[in-house]
C-alpha cells in the first residue's frame, strides 16, 4: 500500500511473468565472450557493440585486424538470431556505407551458427528454406548442425559435419538457448 505495508489481494488466477535468461547449455564460460539478448539493456549493449566494431575497423591499419573487427557471429538461428543477422546485414550494406572513409562496410562478414539442421527450427519447413535463401542472398553465412565448442575474445570454434572450424572475429552474440529466470526457478 501507500505506506509500505503489505496488502492482501484475492485472485482467481495468479500469473507470474518472471522472464527468462540465457542458457549456454552447460558452457557458462561463453557468457563472457558472447553476450545474449533478452532485455532492452542487452539490446542497447548489442547495438553499441556492433556499431563500435565498425569504428574499430575504420581505425585499424592491418587488413587482418580490420577483417576481425568486421566479422559478426551470431549463435542461434531462432527468431532472435535470424532477425539480428538481418539487421547487421542491413546496417553493413545499406545504412553505414557512406559513414566511413577507409573501410567498405559491405565487406562485413556475418555468420549465423545453429545446432539444429535448419534455421528457425520450430517453424514450417517452407519458412525455414525461404529464410535460409533470404539470409544467404543478403550475404549471411549460414552454418547449421554447428555447435560452438570454444571461444575467446578474438575467435569462436564450432563443430559441424565438415569438422571443426575457427572463425576469427571480435563480435559474438548469443541468441541460442533460454532458461528460466532465477525467480521462476524458485517458484517452480
Features from the language model and the residues they span:
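A Rossmann-like FAD-binding core segment of flavoenzymes
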Residues: 89-188
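Short glycine-rich anion-binding loops that position phosphate/pyrophosphate groups of nucleotides
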Residues: 19-22, 85, 178-179
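N-terminal Rossmann-fold NAD(P) dinucleotide-binding loop
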Residues: 81-82
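FAD-binding core/adjacent interface of flavoenzyme oxidoreductases
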Residues: 1-71, 91, 162, 173
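Glycine-rich Rossmann-fold phosphate-binding loop(s) that bind the pyrophosphate
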Residues: 75-78
Amino acid at each position: 500500500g501507500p505506506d509500505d505495508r503489505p496488502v492482501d489481494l484475492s485472485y482467481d488466477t495468479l500469473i507470474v511473468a518472471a522472464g527468462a535468461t540465457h542458457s549456454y547449455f552447460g558452457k557458462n564460460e561463453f557468457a563472457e565472450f558472447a553476450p545474449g539478448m533478452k532485455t532492452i539493456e542487452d539490446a542497447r549493449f548489442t547495438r553499441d557493440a556492433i556499431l563500435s566494431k565498425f569504428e574499430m575497423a575504420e581505425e585499424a591499419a592491418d587488413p587482418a585486424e580490420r577483417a576481425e573487427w568486421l566479422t559478426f557471429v551470431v549463435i542461434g538461428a531462432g527468431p532472435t538470431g535470424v532477425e539480428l543477422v538481418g539487421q547487421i546485414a542491413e546496417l553493413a550494406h545499406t545504412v553505414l556505407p557512406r559513414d566511413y572513409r577507409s573501410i567498405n562496410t559491405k565487406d562485413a562478414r556475418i555468420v549465423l551458427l545453429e545446432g539444429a539442421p535448419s534455421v528457425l527450427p520450430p517453424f514450417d519447413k517452407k519458412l525455414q528454406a525461404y529464410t535460409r535463401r533470404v539470409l544467404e542472398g543478403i550475404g549471411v553465412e549460414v552454418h547449421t548442425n554447428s555447435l560452438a565448442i570454444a571461444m575467446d575474445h578474438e575467435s569462436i570454434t564450432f563443430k559441424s559435419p565438415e569438422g571443426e572450424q575457427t572463425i576469427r572475429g571480435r563480435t559474438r552474440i548469443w541468441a541460442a538457448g533460454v532458461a528460466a529466470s532465477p525467480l521462476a526457478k524458485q517458484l517452480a
